[in-house]
């Protein structure tokens, strides 16, 4: 069995790790970095760029450069958070036929799992290049507060990328695994505060030693799947836009190119202000009007940035309070606070967390890598390479069904340890009712309509009976990935109906299979593109070498030689501009043949010159050779 890799599929950055010889190794990508920007770009010549290459060209190609797509995964187009995102990103977010939020690039609609699959493919290849063998299995992390649709969509992304997703685990739980595996014996309770690029999670986790086994039990989890570093960037961007408007009267919001440059500058300034008190945001030629080019130059202090984002930081405290309450604990019961996610490097975040929990957070966990490390450990547990770890995760939100009067009736309460199974008996609302619709919901509100609809199915052919008489047993079964299976059974007839919840949205099996096929076809297309690029490079090199040879040959090349070679050169140059690899190779071969007589003539002349060198010169060269004396030096080091 091959290795099971651990992937942190982040909103802003992604990371891949593997357990090797008992140690976790975070794998560097082709660019030499341990994290990869979760950015995908589609270029004008049909190439798909992922990671740093995509980020580098974002300024010149904003409409076709996709970032923070994780914020859209498993979401409906109508959701407020999606509508808010549409205003902020330069690329196009559109409504899919099934009502989901998709993106549109170059006239083609694509599902978020399809886009995320490109990042996962890059992670998969990074691991394969390092291990020197194919990788087909992975553990992928998701925010703890992801609902069923979002988890399912993440699993779909893995399948599209050619990965068998062995387990979906929560990011804070993964971070706790990374932190707790090598800790001293004894029980302790930790808070994992995970503020990433696009999501916020907090989990209360008890790490216990049971019969020599590390047991990680999640007591409670809470969060906000639309709060993260991207929102901090947006606040700073808005401030810079306002300052520039005050100064020049120009609103940059309608200029995608300027906004992309601003986004990069804001992110850089935010990072700098974690270690300095003040920074300059300087963007020359950011735009132009009738009076000429305009430059943006704004000084931003740490205090200013903190005032812009203070309410965002405060928004993270209420989920912390709720998680503690759900776990039945007080702040004083917490032994350690672990910070995860790049945004936790901000001093204001660290200060706010320390004030709330009454203790400084640990600094020995790398906030960018801990989640991938934990995923790799879980992968090793599933592969049987690590024996002394037991992970008990929870479902983040209450699951139930809609009952009479539009009420949400919960079957599995939030923070229930998974996997779990729960049944409850319901009945009909009307006399002689022949069918019931089971409407599955997820959320904490009493009103059914206020919760997330996960799907509906019908149980038909119920024998006629007065209302309240038929007994319909509804069973909810959550697997270890946090994905829900629901069944309904008429106890009188034994008739049963069941579904794996794929959400009222989500991708159908046919769509996923099509995307898997597309991804495989793209891999073939990518290989052909690489081969074509290599052929073009070889063609260019041969053109350059041949032109150099003609120049060096001077009058040794006859007019006939030159004419033959120039004709072949022209044909190869034309072929290099085209897209036919076979044509390029054929014209390279033709040019080599055309230039061979001249090359042979020049080689023969050079050889003749070597033989004709005066004997006196050779004798003189021999006289110049000096015998050197040497002494052996012993190295005693």
UniProtKB/Swiss-Prot annotation:
What drives induction of this protein's expression? By stress conditions e.g. heat shock.
Q: Is Transferase included in the keywords of this UniProt record? A: no
Keywords, ordered alphabetically: ATP-binding, Chaperone, Nucleotide-binding, Phosphoprotein, Stress response
Q: Report residue spans for region: Disordered.
A: 603-623
Superkingdom, taxonomy of origin? Bacteria
Report if keyword ATP-binding is assigned: yes
Q: Molecular function (GO) terms listed? A: ATP binding; ATP-dependent protein folding chaperone; unfolded protein binding
Q: Tell me which residues bear Phosphothreonine.
A: 199
* InterPro entries named among the record's database cross-references: ATPase_NBD, Chaperone_DnaK, Heat_shock_70_CS, HSP70_C_sf, HSP70_peptide-bd_sf, Hsp_70_fam
What does the record give as the function of this protein? Acts as a chaperone.
Spell out the family assignment given in the record's similarity comment: Belongs to the heat shock protein 70 family.
Q: What is this protein called?
A: Chaperone protein DnaK
Please tell me the species this chain comes from.
Answer: Pseudomonas aeruginosa (strain LESB58)
Q: Corresponding gene? A: dnaK
